[in-house]
Amino acid sequence: MPDFARLRAKRLFLLDLDGTLYLDERLFDGAADFLRAIRSRGGTYRFLTNNSSRGAESYVEKLRRLGVEAETSDFLTSVDALVAHLHAQGMAEKLLYVCGTQSMKRQLTQAGLRLTDDRDAAVDALVMGFDTELTFQKLEDACILLNRGADYLATNPDWVCPTWYGFVPDCGSVCEMLFRATGRRPYVIGKPRPDMAHLAMVHGGFSAEETVLLGDRLYTDIACGVNAGIDTVLVLSGETKEADLAGSAVQPTFVLGSVAEYLSILQE
């Protein structure tokens, strides 16, 4: 019998978005009530997303459109983790060529980082994001820079991004394509690395024992929680199905059908 009392005792809830709380423009049943229940119990939640294609402001707009009140301070993205990593590694002054959306580039520029779209400039590092504005020219530039020996970072390893009609290639798939062309693999910043989870705990002043991470992907969300040393909840509302657990080296602490099931546990 799962120890649901352990889930009721959590104070910091780290939540994935796509496939966990909503899918495209459809908020999952119970999601809004789950968020309200966390705060009514004196808890805190932070949304963690590997999606670098948009900033926190657009996520706030989306959640409000879906009926959920949110502020930019409720979010930590893979771009936030990238900025923290570059500063920690002494790379804040490096010149970056970013394969990413205009929104991602704007976030990096606002963080004080130096960007260029010129592959012939003295580029120090190539940064790959989930680029919904990807062109073949960007791919060609990336190959040229990698063959020249530029440092190589990526915001996330996700193979696909869920949509209402299925999936589209995400950052990980594009990085795999570049590997086939150049033999280079990136240093990956977002989940499954524990950086975002650690940032959320430090900013909020919460311990690992007080924290739980919820997500729908074993290889990013759940692995992030495992790497951060916190309890994890796999929800079966997104990419991962129950049959996938048997062949996975990464295992969650708990498996629930959806956030609505966690809501029921909180209400017991």
Residue ranges and their predicted role:
Residues N51:
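Conserved phosphate/oxyanion-binding catalytic-loop motifs
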Residues M1-L15, L23-R41, R54-L76, V83-E268:
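Asp-based, Mg2+/Mn2+-dependent phosphohydrolase catalytic module
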Residues T44:
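N-terminal phosphate-binding loop and flanking beta/alpha elements of the actin-like ATPase fold
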